[in-house]
Amino acid sequence: MATKVKFKYKGEEKEVDISKIKKVWRVGKMISFTYDDNGKTGRGAVSEKDAPKELLEKLK
């Protein structure tokens, strides 16, 4: 089963499959990322404590 990352962006609850995530970086205690949103680049962020371990592994 594919891991999903749940996050809020501009007040809207969103969820993205971890396989669509392109780039991951740390900003303080937040993990920011970009993902493929049907051909467009989407952005998201999640707190480090709420991030799935698969997302944290992409930081390395």
Swiss-Prot record:
Residues annotated as transmembrane: none
Record's keyword terms, sorted: Cytoplasm, DNA-binding
Residue ranges of the region described as Disordered: 37-60
pH dependence: Highly stable from pH 0 to pH 12.
InterPro entries noted in UniProt: Chromo-like_dom_sf, DNA-bd_7a-e_arc
Subunit structure of this chain's protein: Monomer.
Name recorded for this polypeptide: DNA-binding protein 7c
Organism of origin: Acidianus hospitalis (strain W1)
